Amino acid sequence: MKYISHTLFVLLLLMLAGCEKPIISDTDTEETVEKKGNLTLTISEVEHTPFPELTRKSASEACNRLNFAVYDTAGSRLKLTHQKLGDADFGTATFQLPEGTYIIVALAHSSNGNPTMTNPEKIQFNNSQGYTDTFLYYKKVVVGTESQTLSLSLHRITSLCRFVVNDAIPEGVAKLEFTYKGGSGSFDASTGYGCVNSTQVMKYDVQADMKQTQYDLYTFLHSTEGSLHLKVTAYDASGNMLFEKSMGVDMYQNQITWLKGNLFSDIQSTPTESFSATVDIDTQWQGELYFTY
């Protein structure tokens, strides 16, 4: 009887194992956590700012998420690690790899989630995660018999439309929605350029009498310059649309385009550009453009 019971137990385990379906995740939760390895990646600077200095800034200024991925030369992902500001190993990732040539991708950003990194030629953020300043490292490396440490310098691949509302938020307006086309929410890591035609959406809760409010709209351009079609929509607390305004915005990679104006006064008028200038070239952004709407 003991033999029969043991046999039945083994058969039951085999049946359960055979019925269980493997879980295949495309949300990039399958991480590689290795304390020791032959390839160590350490972020040294982000857009010319030393990484230790960057992480000492407030959460609103610093990139609070890092992603490290290793691909073979055909683009198949082999390793993946996500890190958040405050993690003990924030800024350093270690992998154990056989000898060979690999593609290394590292990202720094402050999105509400991790991008999909299945394919290095289409790294994708989405509207629910939000779009933030994003920095990239991409390189092919050769792993041999000796362990090595790479010092990574990440560069900015985003463009920023900074939308400033000078007048006060009127009574009844509870939400502002910014919908923009012409850029991309995904990018090709080998180029740093956008790779799809996206409709990006950013939503902000607002309150009456708020003044000089600022809204940052990030995108990945398809080349070094481009333009966005931007639509701003105001809603009440019940989700009813109160009004909307549309405009075109010239954009350049690694530059800020400022849009300033009175959004809620004379909303039927056609927006015009008062002037444009490239100013304040610095180590953070290559330039800034100023317009009024």
Predicted regions and their residues:
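Short amphipathic, basic-aromatic surface patches that mediate peripheral association
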Residues: I24-D28, T32-A59, V165-A168
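Tryptophan-paired
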Residues: S60-T118, A174-Q255, G287-Y293
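A sequence/structural signal for flexible, mid-protein segments enriched
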Residues: N127-Q214
